[in-house]
């Protein structure tokens, strides 16, 4: 055990899952002064909102006691509602498909939580994210996690240098199977706990039902781009670009897919065939651009990009515009680009940053049917 590390205080965001449990265990084994914090971001007494918070906190307590670290629960419900959930609802009202995990990392896990950790004398915060940080000169690079299937840099694309300088990601160099093995070997209470999936405040519940409690659904026509009415939709907010299931269109031939929305007239556009031309575009405009390093970027640069989590990288050219937005031009047409989702830029394994997809284009024209 290193004696130097005992002078370094690391506050670990513990969710009650195996990843954050192993994170705390590893840091404790390495001799750091470790404190576990459970973030309560959602009111689980609410009739609709469940994050299984009580069970999860019980697991945090069990693991913290096993590895011998102090633990606390901190309430970030107000911050979460104001910064993440309100944004989530506002995006759906606009007919877009938001990514609350990106906003949660930016505003809660690496802002509100980081500030709280610093009030406890933390030198660093650590989480169970599958990502890596590396010091290069005066800057910290954000790198993909070794486990390609679990890499979470897509959701961390908005982190700044000030945030990255304060974080540790002990799992970034591991495969998920290794993490489970460490948990089992250490006898951690969460070793066999199932991974959480989906959006935490929705939990295991039906997404449609959850959303309808906060936003009134407005059913309307489901049409082709040529205007043929094929049925009714339940409310534009329930559908995303490229969606196949839940359309209720029968008949022969290939399946039908959502290709766009007309918010003003409350119309959902659908077309037949996975590779229908209307699903493809060759560029987009992104807003809320943020870079993970402070070094000056050229106005135009070539890199790769992801337009959704776990998607294969696509080669792109990024043209930064005077208004701070970015035009992202694809080397080859891409299917089902979705406004509201994140576009994230990479140079090899380095996550350069990203932004929010705003408008979608093809052959120099904006695809108005997409949004």
Swiss-Prot record:
Site-annotated residues for Interaction with tRNA: 129, 341
Annotated positions binding ATP: 13-20, 39, 128
GO molecular function: ATP binding; tRNA binding; tRNA-uridine 2-sulfurtransferase activity
Domain of life: Bacteria
Pfam families found in the cross-reference section: tRNA_Me_trans, tRNA_Me_trans_C, tRNA_Me_trans_M
Catalytic activity line of the entry: S-sulfanyl-L-cysteinyl-[protein] + uridine(34) in tRNA + AH2 + ATP = 2-thiouridine(34) in tRNA + L-cysteinyl-[protein] + A + AMP + diphosphate + H(+)
Disulfide links within the chain: 104-200
Active site location: 104, 200
A single GO cellular-component term on record: cytoplasm
EC identifiers of the protein: 2.8.1.13
Subcellular localization(s) per the UniProt record: Cytoplasm
GO terms under biological process: tRNA wobble position uridine thiolation
InterPro entries: MnmA-like (IPR004506), MnmA-like_C (IPR046885), MnmA-like_central (IPR046884), MnmA-like_central_sf (IPR023382), Rossmann-like_a/b/a_fold (IPR014729)
Ranges where the record places region Interaction with tRNA: 150-152, 308-309
Stretches the record annotates as Interaction with target base in tRNA: 99-101
NCBIfam families noted in UniProt: PRK00143.1 (NF001138), trmU (TIGR00420)
Record-linked HAMAP family: tRNA_thiouridyl_MnmA
Family the entry assigns: Belongs to the MnmA/TRMU family.
Reported function: Catalyzes the 2-thiolation of uridine at the wobble position (U34) of tRNA, leading to the formation of s(2)U34.
PANTHER family: MITOCHONDRIAL TRNA-SPECIFIC 2-THIOURIDYLASE 1, TRNA 5-METHYLAMINOMETHYL-2-THIOURIDYLATE -METHYLTRANSFERASE
Protein name: tRNA-specific 2-thiouridylase MnmA
Originating organism: Listeria innocua serovar 6a (strain ATCC BAA-680 / CLIP 11262)
Organism placement in taxonomy: Bacteria, Bacillati, Bacillota, Bacilli, Bacillales
């Amino acid at each position: 055990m290193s004696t130097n590390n005992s002078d370094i205080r690391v506050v670990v965001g513990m969710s009650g899952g195996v990843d954050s449990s192993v994170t705390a265990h590893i840091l404790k084994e390495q001799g750091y002064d470790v404190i576990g914090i459970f973030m309560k971001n959602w009111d689980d007494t609410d009739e609709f909102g469940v994050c299984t918070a009580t069970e999860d906190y019980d697991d945090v307590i069990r693991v913290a006691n096993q590895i011998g670290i102090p633990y606390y629960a901190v309430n970030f419900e107000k911050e979460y509602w104001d910064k993440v959930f309100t944004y989530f609802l506002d995006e759906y009202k606009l007919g877009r498909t938001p990514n609350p995990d990106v906003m949660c990392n930016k505003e809660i896990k690496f802002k509100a939580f980081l500030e709280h950790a610093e009030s406890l004398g933390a030198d660093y915060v650590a989480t169970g994210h599958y990502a890596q940080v590396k010091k290069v000169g005066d800057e910290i690079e954000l790198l993909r996690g070794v486990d390609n299937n679990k890499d979470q840099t897509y959701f961390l694309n908005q982190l700044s240098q000030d945030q990255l300088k304060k974080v540790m990601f002990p799992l970034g160099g591991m495969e998920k199977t290794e993490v489970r093995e460490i948990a089992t070997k250490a006898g951690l209470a969460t070793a066999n706990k199932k991974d959480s999936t989906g959006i935490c405040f929705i939990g295991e519940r039906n997404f449609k039902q959850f959303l309808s409690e906060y936003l009134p659904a407005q059913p309307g026509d489901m049409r082709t781009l040529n205007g043929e009415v094929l049925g009714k939709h339940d409310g534009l907010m329930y559908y995303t670009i490229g969606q196949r299931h839940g359309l209720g269109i029968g008949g022969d031939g290939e399946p039908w897919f959502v290709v766009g929305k007309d918010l003003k007239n409350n119309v959902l556009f659908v077309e037949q065939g996975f590779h229908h031309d209307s699903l493809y575009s060759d560029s987009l405009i992104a807003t809320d651009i943020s870079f993970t390093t402070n070094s000056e970027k050229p106005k135009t640069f070539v890199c790769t990009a992801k337009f959704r989590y776990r998607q294969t990288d696509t080669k792109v050219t990024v043209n930064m515009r005077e208004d701070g937005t970015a035009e992202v031009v694809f080397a080859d047409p891409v299917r089902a680009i979705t406004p509201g989702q994140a576009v994230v830029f990479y140079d090899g394994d380095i996550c350069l940053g990203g932004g929010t997809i705003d408008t979608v284009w093809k052959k120099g024209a904006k695809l108005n049917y997409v949004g």
